[in-house]
Structure formats: structure tokens, C-alpha cells
């Protein structure tokens, strides 16, 4: 299917498996949101992006009353995170969100948050849903009339009982996203479009490959295809948890390899978070290309509010952990940089290409510029 067919089918409302007619989504993104929702005839627009935010507040009893974990060490670590979150949301994170809101202009079509919008770790369905609602409405109030979309992160579905936390997410988020997109969102994997471009949201917690394959099929011919996923598609360079990527925990790599090949043949751009880092990876293989941009808004201390590259270049990928895990992927890497920086991001999209400006902390000028296409 070529791009002209994709556009014709989009206008006819024949794409968007999980959210219904894509034409409805496009109309809500372009035609019913006032000046900021005005469609650009030349296909040029911007997307404001926030990485993990881990919304929380003090005292920890506000959201975490009744929370416990059967593993005392793990619970102690989680409670350290509560304290970290409360401290950063008392000052730094509101400044970061305010800075992100200032990046919105008349060409901005979407605000995207990469998942882990909340800390999670609540004691039940309603508590998880309330925390999600409070976080979403906080960001929505700051960003104004521009549609806000998020994907499911591991913290968004983590609680005293993960099954109840996930139920809380399902209770709140699909309905709230339906309001943002102007059409029904039924599940955690869904697609919508902005003009000639396809956006496919993927739940990495419980991958539904068959649904994702259908979404890829139904959006063939898009100018650009963006994969919105909380975790990366490729392993990230860290001292631990490097296997926290799409299908990275599977003992059998067949599903991982199959989906990576499908993504590569579509030349997708992956917009993700999870690792609390600002990382750019451009990879060629499997008959195509995957460009991955990992983003972070966990401004945990003063140092993460500045941009400082820790590793870059082909040999830099995996250099921090030193794990053999990266040997499989390194030959396809054509561009790479890694920083433990937090901030906000502005993605600019046009026929000429795609770029992202990164604003560390609440800086008024770009700290880094990434060319994705």
C-alpha cells in the first residue's frame, strides 16, 4: 500500500483497529481543537514529549496507604522512590512541565508522555485510577487544548496487587484517551494518525503482537510510522535491567526478532522512555531501519537537569554495562549517544525529515538536537 492509498483509506475511516475510524482521530487532532489543532497543509507539525514523570506527592500516605510488598528489600526500594518523587514534584518537575508547555505553538498537534506517568504502588483499583487521573489532569491543565496521549508503563500497572493496578489503569485510561482523540480507545494497543503519519501505541507490559501486526498492516503507506512504547525496542545500556525492552525478557527470541523485523521493514521511529535517560540509537538491519529515541522527565537531582553525554558512537553502545547482550545489535548501529539527563522534548516533523530538540531541566534553549530522519 503506497502513501496515496493510506491517505485515501485514512480519510474513509478504514484504519485504526483499536480506536475506530482514523479519520475521526485525525479530525479531533486537527479540526476541533482551535488554533493549536489547525492542520498544516504542508505536513509540517510538532509534538511535545515528556518522558517518565512518576507523578507523586508527599506524604506517601496520600497515594500509597495500604501498599506493601512481600519482598522487604523491594518495598524499601519503592519507598525510597516515593521520597525521590515527592522531592522532585515539590519543585523541579512542575518547572519542567511548565517549560514543556511553553514549547506548544500553533503547529503543535500532540503532547505525548512515554508511560510511567505515575509512580503507582497503590493498594487497589480505585487508588490506582485516582493517581492516574490526578497525574493526567495535572499535565492536561498545563498543556491546554492540545490532545494528550500516554502509553502503559510498568509503574502505571504496578501496585500491591499488580492485577488490581492494571485494572485501575484500564478503568481510567482508555476512556480518558478516547476523549483526547475524539474516538473510542478500547485497549492498550491502538493507532491514530496525524495527517500522513501513523502513530501506533504498544503495551510493552503484555505484548499483543497480533494486534500490533494488524495495526501495522492497516497503516501501510504512511509517510512516517511512529511506535509509541514505554520501553525501548533495543536493550539500553545500564548496570542492570538491560533486558527491560520489547520482548527482552522472553527466553525464546522468536517474537522479539519477528517484531523487530516488522518494525525495521516499516522504517519505524520508536519514541520511548523507561530507562530514565536521553538516548539516541539509529539501527540498520532486518531489511530496513529503526530509529529509537528514549526520553526522560525524571528530574531527580540538579545533575540530571544538565546535558552531559556519557557514551556515544558505535562502540559506545553497551560500553557502560559491558554486557555481551549488546554484541548482537552493535553491528547495525549507525548512530548512538547516551546521557542521564531529564527534561522535555519537541519533535518537529515535515516532508524534509524529523528532528527532536531536547531541553534539559527547565532550560530555555535546546541542550541537544537529534536528527531522526
Task: Kindly give the residue locations of the regions a language model identified.
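N-terminal export signals
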Residues: 5-28
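N-terminal active-site segment of His-dependent metallophosphoesterases
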Residues: 28-126
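Extended active-site neighborhood of metal-dependent phosphoesterases/phosphodiesterases
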Residues: 37, 66-79, 83, 122-224, ...
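Short, solvent-exposed loop/turn elements at domain surfaces
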Residues: 45-47, 55-61, 209-212, 301-304, ...
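Residue-level marker for buried hydrophobic side chains located in beta-strands
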Residues: 47-49, 113, 150, 227, ...
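Active-site glycine-centered loops adjacent to acidic/histidine catalytic or metal-binding residues
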Residues: 52, 115-116, 153-154, 230, ...
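Short acidic, glycine-rich surface-loop motifs adjacent to enzyme active sites
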Residues: 221-242
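Histidine-centered catalytic micro-motifs
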Residues: 228-233, 270-278
Amino acid at each position: 500500500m503506497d502513501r496515496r492509498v493510506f491517505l485515501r483509506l485514512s480519510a474513509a475511516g478504514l484504519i485504526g483497529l483499536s480506536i475506530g475510524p482514523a479519520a475521526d482521530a485525525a479530525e479531533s487532532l486537527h479540526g476541533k481543537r482551535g488554533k493549536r489543532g489547525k492542520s498544516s497543509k504542508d505536513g509540517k507539525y510538532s509534538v511535545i514529549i515528556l518522558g517518565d514523570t512518576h507523578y507523586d506527592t508527599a506524604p506517601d500516605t496520600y497515594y500509597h496507604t495500604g501498599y506493601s510488598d512481600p519482598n522487604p528489600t523491594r518495598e524499601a526500594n519503592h519507598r525510597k522512590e516515593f521520597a525521590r518523587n515527592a522531592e522532585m514534584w515539590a519543585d523541579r518537575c512542575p518547572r519542567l512541565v511548565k517549560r514543556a508547555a511553553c514549547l506548544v505553538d500553533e503547529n503543535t498537534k500532540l503532547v505525548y508522555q512515554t508511560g510511567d506517568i505515575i509512580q503507582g504502588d497503590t493498594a487497589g483499583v480505585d487508588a490506582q485510577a485516582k493517581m492516574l487521573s490526578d497525574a493526567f489532569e495535572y499535565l492536561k491543565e498545563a498543556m491546554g487544548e492540545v490532545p494528550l496521549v500516554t502509553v502503559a508503563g510498568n509503574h502505571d500497572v504496578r501496585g500491591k496487587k499488580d492485577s488490581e493496578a492494571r485494572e485501575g489503569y484500564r478503568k481510567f485510561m482508555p476512556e480518558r484517551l478516547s476523549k483526547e482523540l475524539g474516538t473510542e480507545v478500547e485497549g492498550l494497543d491502538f493507532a491514530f494518525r496525524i495527517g500522513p503519519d501513523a502513530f501506533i501505541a504498544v503495551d510493552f507490559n503484555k505484548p499483543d503482537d497480533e494486534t500490533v501486526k494488524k495495526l501495522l498492516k492497516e497503516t501501510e503507506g504512511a509517510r512516517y510510522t511512529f511506535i509509541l512504547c514505554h520501553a525501548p525496542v533495543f536493550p539500553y545500556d545500564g548496570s542492570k535491567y538491560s533486558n527491560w525492552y520489547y520482548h527482552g525478557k522472553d527466553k525464546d527470541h522468536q517474537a522479539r526478532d519477528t517484531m523487530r523485523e516488522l518494525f525495521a521493514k516499516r522504517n519505524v521511529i520508536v519514541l520511548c522512555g523507561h530507562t530514565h535517560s536521553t538516548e539516541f540509537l539509529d539501527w540498520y538491519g532486518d531489511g530496513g531501519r529503526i530509529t529509537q529515541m528514549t526520553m526522560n522527565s525524571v528530574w531527580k537531582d540538579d545533575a540530571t537537569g544538565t546535558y552531559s553525554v556519557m557514551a556515544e558512537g558505535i562502540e559506545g553502545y553497551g560500553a557502560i554495562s559491558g554486557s555481551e547482550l549488546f554484541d548482537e545489535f552493535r553491528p547495525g548501529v549507525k548512530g548512538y549517544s547516551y546521557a542521564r539527563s531529564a527534561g522535555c522534548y519537541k519533535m518537529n516533523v515535515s516532508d524534509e525529515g524529523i528532528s527532536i530538540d531536547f531541553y534539559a531541566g527547565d532550560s530555555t534553549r535546546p541542550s541537544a538536537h537529534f536528527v531522526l530522519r
